Structures are given as C-alpha cells and as structure tokens.
C-alpha cells in the first residue's frame, strides 16, 4: 500500500478555467504475473480546490512499467471523479478521465496528466 500527496492544476474543459489543487490518497499495487517490470495499482485520491475549498475524489486504476536498471516508471491511468462537488470542482462531477503516469527516480516525483475521455456516454444532468 502507498500513501501519497501532491499538488497541481486542473483545467475545466468547457471554460479553460485553471483550478489550483492539492491531493492525497492511498493506492494498492502488485506485480503483474509473468511481467515482472509491470505493476498494477488502484486507489482513491481526495482532491481539494485551493481556490474555494471545494472537495471531490477520484477512483483510479493504473498499469505502470518500470525500467529495472533506472527505476523510471511510465504507464497509463483511468479514473472517474465522484459526483459530489458543489463549487469549482463541480464541472468534473462524474467525469471519466484517462492519462499518463510518469515517475522520475532522480527527483523522486510522479507526474500524472489526465484528460477527459471523449468516447464515453453522456452523463445525465441533475
């Protein structure tokens, strides 16, 4: 199990508004059988808007491959946002996202970039 925290920005797809955010969460990972350089992980991430204090969370799944000599990792991410935000994070309610996971062992950082999945079914409006 891994515990993580971070910060970054989120861009609202329809308006381009930039939201400053922090996050924390937990993930469970394991090696993929017969692919010793590949890890799967899944978990929950709490997302907090620095701008207005709004909160949300995502459930995510990742497949990450590592270079065993450098420990650099790269992979793919799928995630879905909870549908409970009421402030600046509300445009992300129920949004399905996909992206990339990049680990840099020299800086001990992970960068995750997510994009709205455009091939999904339309969400019902409240």
Walk through the language-model features, giving the residues of each.
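Beta-strand-enriched cores of mature, soluble protein domains
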Residues: 1-126
């Amino acid at each position: 199990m891994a515990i993580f925290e971070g910060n970054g920005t989120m861009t609202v797809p329809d308006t381009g508004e930039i939201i400053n955010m922090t996050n924390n969460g937990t993930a469970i990972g394991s090696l993929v059988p017969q692919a010793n350089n590949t890890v799967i992980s899944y978990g929950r991430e709490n997302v907090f808007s620095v701008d207005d204090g709004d909160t949300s969370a995502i459930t995510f799944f990742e497949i990450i491959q590592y270079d065993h000599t450098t420990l650099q990792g790269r992979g793919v991410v799928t995630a879905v946002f909870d549908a409970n935000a009421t402030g600046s994070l509300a445009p992300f309610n129920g949004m399905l996202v996909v992206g990339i996971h990049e680990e840099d062992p020299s800086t001990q950082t992970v960068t995750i970039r997510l994009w709205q999945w455009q091939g999904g079914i339309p969400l019902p409006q409240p």
